[in-house]
């Protein structure tokens, strides 16, 4: 109750004194404006969003004359598709909402059609300075204006099934600390495959997976940045950069020899069935990890997870990707644009932001929330996975730099093509390796299976 009361107090302060830059416009509680909001949050995230909306409508909305009406659309891709249809003027496209969750790449399309309102005029420099600089920077499009406001921001971390890892560690001496680098992670994959294969000496070649990445493309982007270079040359990929070979090798060797799961799906699905020990993925994925796993024979086992910062390459810089979406405001009347800005301020006020963070796995978006609210939330939250995630989020905030992916029209196609072709190349090499390993030593079989694979991928 104290947390709710504090949040309401902050929102009431917003209602009476928060107007941003410029003069007050014609917001009038006697003649309220209705704003439509699109988001893609489901399950517990939708419940949290509903609470944020209800609190806003009962406080700032009531005081200033704003009624927020929400539409939840299943899946982020569906929201972006509808917004893209609006930008293209497609027949049958829905009406543009007043506010919507949106990625920068989609915002570019809307902005080019004059459909978005710049948010710079709604916030003072002091107000914007309260947010994490890189989060705000990502929302500034090519002309430098702020169009995408930080809201549901995330990064990638390493999720570890601590229960299963402990058995492996006790038997082999592999430590959690060794997973802090991709080289150590790659070696652990090979060691785990070897160890699990040895548990069934009468069934050779049945070693198990240790690790997978939800996005090999994100791993490549961040890995290249950690190594002091970049994956991109304009809108093309710099796969001929010598540093890329290191990015390739840490995944290729365990993917082909065993231990890395070449899997076209979410890593949490493999984790929940005990098929992997660890994975790199979005912090928002924490909501899909519970406190037990269910094996293929339907037996269950209680487990605990550990959340570690995103691994780095040996001697590389501590860099992690900046993920998630922000919110955009439709170009409209001065009243509606001001009202929409008040919604953004209300949703991202530290107390309200922490309420969203505490049940979703997203990151705080303000410095104050990171520096002054996280510890209290850790103490108050009864979900041990969220507690661990927040502790790691603070560590990333203090020690890492955030990498912002570039924005250009072909980015999604480039990302999708990379993922598909990389998985195909690794899967094919794995099949060849298994055949060759029947008559060759492991290293010899690996070299033969990988002959020309890297060169073909780089020159594709």
Language model features: what each stretch is:
Residues 120-131, 174-178, 203-204, 209-210, ...:
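Short, solvent-exposed loop/beta-turn-alpha elements that line the ligand-binding surface or hinge
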Residues 380, 387, 391-460:
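Conserved C-terminal helix/tail region of periplasmic/extracytoplasmic solute-binding proteins
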Residues 88, 253-256, 296-369:
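Extracytoplasmic/periplasmic substrate-recognition and gating elements
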Residues 43-67, 108:
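Short, polar/charged alpha-helical segment
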Residues 61-134, 167-168, 277-278, 296-299:
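Extracytoplasmic "Venus flytrap"/periplasmic binding protein-like
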Residues 145-151, 156, 183-236:
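Extracytoplasmic/periplasmic solute-binding protein
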Residues 186-193, 233-264, 305, 310:
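Glycine-centered hinge/linker elements that transmit conformational signals in sensory
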Residues 101-157, 186, 201-204, 300-311:
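Hinge/lid segment of periplasmic solute-binding proteins
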